[in-house]
Amino acid sequence: MGDQPRRDKSLRDKPWIFRTYAGHSTAAASNELYRKNLSKGQTGLSVAFDLPTQTGYDSDHPLAKGEVGKVGVPVSHIGDMRALFEAIPLGEMNTSMTINATAAWLLALYVALADEQDVPRAKLQGTTQNDIIKEYLSRGTYVFPPAPSMRLTKDVILFTTKEMPKWNPMNVCSYHLQEAGATPVQELAFALATAIGVLDAVRASGQCAPEEFGDVVGRISFFVNAGLRFVTEICKLRAFTELWDEITRERYGVTDAKQRLFRYGVQVNSLGLTEQQPENNVARILLEMLAVTLSKDARARAVQLPAWNEALGLPRPFDQQWSLRMQQILAYETDLLEYGDVFAGSPVIAAKVAELKAAAKDELKHIEAMGGTVKAVESGYLKQRLVESNCRRIEAIERGEQIVVGVNRFTETEASPLTDAAESVVTVSAEAESGQIERLAAWRAARDPKAVAAALEALRRAAKSGANIMPPS
């Protein structure tokens, strides 16, 4: 281990895409934040939508009250999408959209905006998260039952494969599973079971020619978590890489090695960020980032880091800049990208990877025996396993068996100048919500009601007939 020759600097590995997860208040305010972050060296966008947008409610719906713009940007129509990407050329951008239950419609708005900018759809690069299965297990922003949700996911995949070949139509999310308490084995197995369920649905639909199925597989990406158990996380990512290669080759017959690559982006663990002594979170975030970048054979291709104070509230631009600079320092000031895989040949790493793979395969067999991931969700099995794991995690912290610095050990502290300021986090004003509602009312008043009715009827027909819902969206 570590005895590989130094790589020629001309053969440096390319840095991953630098992102920050951002969006709040209004589309215009979020656009200003995006352009500011891009000017600081960020190389991709990661859009956070507010809860009404994630669950299909317009900003003026009674259930949206108090949530508009609070944890993300509100988008109700193409006008909001225009404001969100004002002066940002979509043909030159790599955009990740954290959207699931309403992914088809948010992607449709993005494509419509690209059409307005005369950007060929084939040139668009980015990702729709579009993993509705994990919504039943962790986040809860689902709209439809599991089976119809799987149909929506399938439609987006089939549409982008033909129209947007550089787009990742789905980010299979193990990230949220870990946030909900998943063990590394559960994170591996549950995420891979979701990917299998989706690919099986695409193949069974009869809407994808066999010779095109490899293209579908090749565009599936993953959104992975990385916690502080450093060695285990490195091994988990290597296990993901090896298991995905096996599944795509053996189950789906994909012969192109490039299409079998485990392509993933990452946000490091937010669950472990603490309100107590939040300055310690800087060290946590940096260590977790190392777990997804050190191992070249399983290195993330896109990274977004939470800000140190996200346990307290929405981060300020300065806080997001701090996280961005951590990525840039690692990529450009260290020699990390000049070497091959520094863990290759390590018996410790190999043994742990083998252990994780074997346990994940056993869990995958169990899920398959239940009828697959949808059945495992409907039965409550997957949710029950996550709840049990999370209870064990919390109990270990409360008993002091799992040490969390500043929480259950080393709790004496000085006052922090970082959190003493009155505006140490961003707050969303009530005026942001009222202004959004006023703009939405004006938009509705100006549109052609006949065109609206015709568009909704076309979408309704597609939904009922089984046709792909993306074109009429």
Model feature map: region roles:
Residues 1, 316-317, 321-328, 332-473:
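Flexible, glycine-rich loop/tail regions that form catalytic "lids" or insertion modules at the edges
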Residues 1-233, 251-254, 258-265, 301-306:
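Catalytic alpha/beta active-site cores
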Residues 51-52, 101, 127-133, 171-179, ...:
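A glycine-rich phosphate-binding loop feature that marks nucleotide/adenosyl-phosphate handling sites
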Residues 65-70, 95, 134-144, 177-181, ...:
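Short beta-alpha connecting loops at secondary-structure transitions
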Residues 192-195, 222-225, 230-315, 319-323:
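Glycine-rich anion/phosphate-binding loop at the beta-strand->alpha-helix junction
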Residues 131-134, 149-206, 283-364, 370:
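Mobile "lid/hinge" segments at catalytic clefts and subdomain interfaces of large enzymes
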Residues 27-36, 282-290, 407:
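Short, acidic/polar
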Residues 41, 77, 118, 244, ...:
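Conserved, mostly hydrophobic/aromatic
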